[in-house]
Amino acid sequence: MSAVPLSHQPGLKNDDWAQRAVAIDWPTTTEALHQQGNAVLPQLLSATECAALARLYGNADESTFRSRVVMQRHGFGQGEYRYFSYPLPDVVAGLREALYPHLAPIANQWNTAMGIDVRYPTRHADFIARCHAAGQVRPTPLLLQYAAGDYNCLHQDLYGEHVFPLQRHTLGVIFHDAG
């Protein structure tokens, strides 16, 4: 599936996502993921890009998203999220493609440590092909929306047999409205 260029969305540009991924301090990031289950990637996106993505939640054409989940209905917490549709926004597709080759070795280490035989391919396209061959054809990237006091309980939205262990709660971009 190809990405949607969001040139009509101010602040989103087709950038060299691979260059941003290479600039990340991966040894420190890997260690943080091993020790804490999360890592901070400062300045992965600019403030303008974050603002443009955050605006998508309420202002995007409905075809941008495939479904909406109100977390309290499912015991997932307080707040809501929307799953993107294909084609994904350029920034989402670009980051997913660029970060995956760095995250796959971590996922493989975790599976080895847990005695799980599944290994993740080095290329994101190969993992997506594996998922699609198994009938898992819906995109899983999503955009969360929280108000003051909202929260997310630890949970997994499992969709089929093939699951990448570093899911969106491990790789999340937090947009903060200072107002």
Feature roles, as predicted:
Residues M1-H169, H176-G179:
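Fe(II)/2-oxoglutarate oxygenase catalytic core
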